[in-house]
């Protein structure tokens, strides 16, 4: 399944014309197609995916427009008329992903991070830029691979190998998971190299057309592909990459936490012990906890390694839940497959004594990629007045889902999943919206330092 310049917006016509300038022809793209699947196998796995969601999800209608779900499921299934490679099957099945309105639900290539990593280790390449969406909706260069000249952060991306930006985004966003279109954009931006590889393949070298950020004619650059993966696509990120802290101008403490991964528990505990001890010793004016790049993980990490260090107030991250009973969570007397709905009135109480506890004002800076356990952290902090939330309305819904279960698809080996629990935030309100900020600060995804500087400036103006 390949794509070419077929959409005729002015931007894409410009891109196609520029790329048509005389240059040596690029190599044919190479793909990791995987095994070929028969029509019967494709239908069996698609039906298995749909049946698995119905059997495990406690209530699809909490997120999903069921009429759209039924229509799109039928359309995708009806188009399974012949054999496909596993890559093509994913591209086809994944058209249902956006309609699930939940980044905990959907279908992916199995272990795509590992597959990309192996591709690079065996001499392959990925696109030599990372991208982010600007506030005007344009796709901008975020970082550039070493050795690439003529392309700079902030440049507007026009095309890659003749594929116009509008065309690429239409193909990628129509297969992206996520609660909202804003989250889907954040998801695609951070996995742009993965989407590009599965849609358009690897050509080793890439023809990039960009418009400089400071306004001049579009320019075309041929560059060798990158040989390292963006942070969000690395199979195993280091603790040094995920966590950092420092003191900002004006004696404001800053702690960046890019994940609540269970395997980083000890590393996070070590960093936060050191950071909070420094913030306390410095008598910092305020503390910023930056979770803009944190897509979640395990709740105990933010509870024990963050909240315990800045409050003694009891709190919770939910007030109600709906859960599907499975053999893994059943209590004696529960019926497997039944759905239970219950209020939640338990509270987590931080220890009364914490040698490194910080007692000043705390601001949690969120962004469009903040998700899952990070949203749970935000709503607990906001609804129990533990800290103030800064930024814009989150792209993820304030009432999250969780306890994600895998749906076995034995024919294709594709990776499908769905959550078995849906939470209501502590306030019981606002489930159809993101988390609304207490301190509105414009989010600049292209130049993230500007957002942090703006919050730092706002805090200093308050005292």
Which positions does each model-derived feature cover?
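Conserved acidic, small-residue-rich alpha-beta core segments centered on
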Residues: 299-451, 457-458
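Secreted/luminal cysteine- and crosslink-motif detector
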Residues: 6, 17-18, 432
């Amino acid at each position: 399944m390949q794509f070419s310049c077929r959409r005729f917006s002015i931007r894409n016509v410009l891109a196609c014309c520029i790329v048509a300038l005389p240059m040596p022809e690029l190599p044919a793209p190479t793909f990791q197609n995987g095994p070929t699947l028969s029509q019967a196998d494709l239908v069996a796995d698609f039906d298995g995916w749909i049946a698995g969601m119905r059997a495990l999800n406690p209530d699809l209608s909490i997120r999903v427009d069921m009429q759209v779900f039924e229509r799109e499921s039928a359309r995708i299934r009806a188009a399974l008329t012949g054999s496909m490679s596993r890559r093509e099957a994913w591209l086809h099945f994944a058209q249902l992903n956006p309609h699930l309105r939940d980044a905990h639900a959907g279908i992916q290539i199995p272990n795509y991070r590992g597959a990309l990593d192996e591709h690079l280790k065996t001499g392959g390449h990925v696109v030599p830029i990372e991208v982010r969406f600007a506030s005007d909706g344009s796709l901008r260069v975020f970082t550039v691979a070493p050795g690439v000249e003529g392309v700079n952060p902030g440049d507007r991306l026009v095309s890659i190998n003749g594929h116009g930006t509008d065309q690429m985004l239409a193909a990628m966003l129509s297969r992206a998971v996520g609660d909202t279109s804003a989250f889907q954009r954040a998801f695609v931006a951070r996995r742009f190299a993965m989407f590009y590889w599965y849609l358009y393949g690897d050509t080793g070298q890439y023809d990039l057309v960009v418009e400089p950020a400071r306004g001049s004619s579009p320019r075309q650059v041929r560059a060798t592909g990158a040989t390292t993966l963006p942070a969000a696509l690395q199979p195993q990120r280091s603790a040094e990459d995920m966590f950092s802290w420092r003191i900002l101008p004006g004696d404001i403490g800053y702690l960046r936490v890019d994940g609540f991964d269970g395997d980083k528990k000890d590393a996070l505990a070590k960093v936060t012990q050191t950071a909070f001890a420094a913030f306390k010793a410095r008598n910092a004016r305020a503390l910023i906890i930056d979770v803009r790049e944190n897509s979640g993980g395990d709740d105990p990490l933010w509870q024990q390694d963050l909240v315990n260090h800045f409050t003694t107030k009891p709190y919770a991250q939910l007030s109600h839940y709906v859960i599907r009973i499975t053999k893994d969570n059943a209590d004696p007397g529960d019926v497997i497959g039944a759905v239970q709905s219950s209020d939640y009135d338990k509270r987590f109480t931080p220890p009364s004594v914490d040698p490194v506890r910080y007692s000043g004002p705390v601001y949690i800076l969120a962004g469009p990629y903040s998700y899952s356990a990070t949203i749970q952290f935000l709503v607990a902090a906001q609804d129990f007045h533990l800290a103030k939330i800064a930024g814009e309305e989150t792209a993820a819904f304030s009432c999250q889902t969780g306890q994600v279960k895998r749906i076995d698809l034995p024919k294709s080996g594709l990776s499908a999943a769905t959550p078995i629990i849906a939470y209501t935030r502590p306030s019981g309100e606002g489930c159809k919206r993101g988390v609304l900020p207490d301190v509105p600060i414009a989010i600049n995804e292209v130049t993230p330092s500007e957002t942090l500087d703006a919050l730092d400036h706002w805090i200093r103006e308050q005292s």
